Amino acid sequence: MGKIESNERVILNVGGTRHETYRSTLKTLPGTRLALLASSEPQGDCLTAAGDKLQPLPPPLSPPPRPPPLSPVPSGCFEGGAGNCSSHGGNGGNGGSDHPGGGREFFFDRHPGVFAYVLNYYRTGKLHCPADVCGPLFEEELAFWGIDETDVEPCCWMTYRQHRDAEEALDIFETPDLIGGDPGDDEDLAAKRLGIEDAAGLGGPDGKSGRWRKLQPRMWALFEDPYSSRAARFIAFASLFFILVSITTFCLETHEAFNIVKNKTEPVINGTSPVLQYEIETDPALTYVEGVCVVWFTFEFLVRIVFSPNKLEFIKNLLNIIDFVAILPFYLEVGLSGLSSKAAKDVLGFLRVVRFVRILRIFKLTRHFVGLRVLGHTLRASTNEFLLLIIFLALGVLIFATMIYYAERVGAQPNDPSASEHTQFKNIPIGFWWAVVTMTTLGYGDMYPQTWSGMLVGALCALAGVLTIAMPVPVIVNNFGMYYSLAMAKQKLPRKRKKHIPPAPLASSPTFCKTELNMACNSTQSDTCLGKENRLLEHNRSVLSGDDSTGSEPPLSPPERLPIRRSSTRDKNRRGETCFLLTTGDYTCASDGGIRKGYEKSRSLNNIAGLAGNALRLSPVTSPYNSPCPLRRSRSPIPSIL
């Protein structure tokens, strides 16, 4: 019993922290990296597939002799399914070492703190998220170990989702262009940021397309991004100045001091008394000022639409539509001012009404002030809260308008059946206005109850309004605070031109290799192995098949080979780079093979019946250990860093 228990124990050294558990514990989550590691170890309790049911293989009749050792496999390419698991001394090719305590030890160069939660998931069936670990790091570790993120417990789901909410909020606010670094990369970065790198690449090698490729992003950034250069800041200040002048002019046009009353009375032929007609004209000085502003806005609009990287998106933008609608009436008004027909006067009257669109230019200030952008994003993010507030108000208005109508009719006189003499609430629709004014605590005083029952309803209406409005407001305020803090944090983010790349390993490093292929193989983040493993395949295969007579069990037939569930959601673009101990001719990989990333289906201990799904099937090999279980290996979803 002691020997069986020692063989069942396994030690996992993750980032220098040793964890000890049993193989049966690791097998509780089939299809994950540790389950593949536990299943790949040669043992007498290996499983075989008999139809759709997994059955244990019978124990060997007699202890087989110990086979010759396999050649060591470089770290990062382990046949037992450990990903970048490295062994402490070879022992039967299992990638682990016999520990003095009786277990086998495997090393993973991963985050030790997160692995404690991962291993606890195997033990208890409940996956919790550590509060002191950044969300992307925990997500990356879950992907490496092949665990569904949807298995996170509901109590920790908000903690796990916080980083995604923050990333989505940060993506909303555009950061200024990075300053410094290699000047040769400016054009490529600008083209990539503006989304025109593909179009620029198709321009051809001629000089015209080359000049356009250089000019387009510069001109677009000059009028679109105030932080791209000093000239862009000057353009932004000029645009801001003309916006403020235009709005000021629009407001002053309504003042009596700038309105000139002209007599437009026309003589009436064959008439006795002509009708006096007066028109109000705006001071010509304000008209000239507005004309200068419109000329600037026209120039800015034309430049932006010409150098826009995406004309369709430019036209669909709401601010650009407002800009165009605010510019067009001025030119139509100038063109029709010389006409005296009735139709022209009607059109001019309509255009004067459309002038109010100019006030919407104030929203163009959102390009220059972060607070206004934060306010806009807060309003969009709080749509559900605003909808909830409207529903609450609508319910309250309907209820209290009905109550005030009947409450005021209680004291009506017998000779006044409509109660119109002693109350202003003659019908329920009139009570809607009173209920809205009361619930929003405005209290104009134009309508008020006059009976004791009506006063009681009015008091209840005011209290309900205060409570109703106060409930969604904190959520909206919290959204504004979150967006504003994230916007400030992104503005203060250190400006980096290039991502840090770790240096190549030194000659004294255990992962040092002489070729680039082996460097990728020995990386702690890599599963690609294309180098010297080819020289070990024939040797290992010959060792595994050299003593076929020692095994008491026949090799598995193809239908009986053990399937291993894999998912199509993990790293589809690297299917052809997986490194197995056997060559590609010795196995058949399903078209959707890969460690599942865990975005499609939740998996827990209650809904796992065994290994199912698409299979990775290996050729039958009879082992001297009398166990026909094939060697299996999963690949890491994390690409190589070297």
Curated annotation (Swiss-Prot):
One term under GO cellular component: apical plasma membrane
Glycan attachment residues as annotated in the record: 263, 270
Transmembrane segments: 234-254, 287-307, 318-338, 350-372, 386-406, 457-477
Reactions listed under catalytic activity: K(+)(in) = K(+)(out)
Quaternary structure, from the entry: Homotetramer and heterotetramer with other channel-forming alpha subunits, such as KCNC1. Interacts with KCNC1. Homotetramer or heterotetramer channel activity is regulated by association with modulating ancillary subunits such as KCNE1, KCNE2 and KCNE3, creating a functionally diverse range of channel complexes. Interacts with KCNE1, KCNE2 and KCNE3.
Entry similarity comment: Belongs to the potassium channel family. C (Shaw) (TC 1.A.1.2) subfamily. Kv3.2/KCNC2 sub-subfamily.
Protein name in the entry: Voltage-gated potassium channel KCNC2
Lineage per the UniProt record: Eukaryota, Metazoa, Chordata, Craniata, Vertebrata
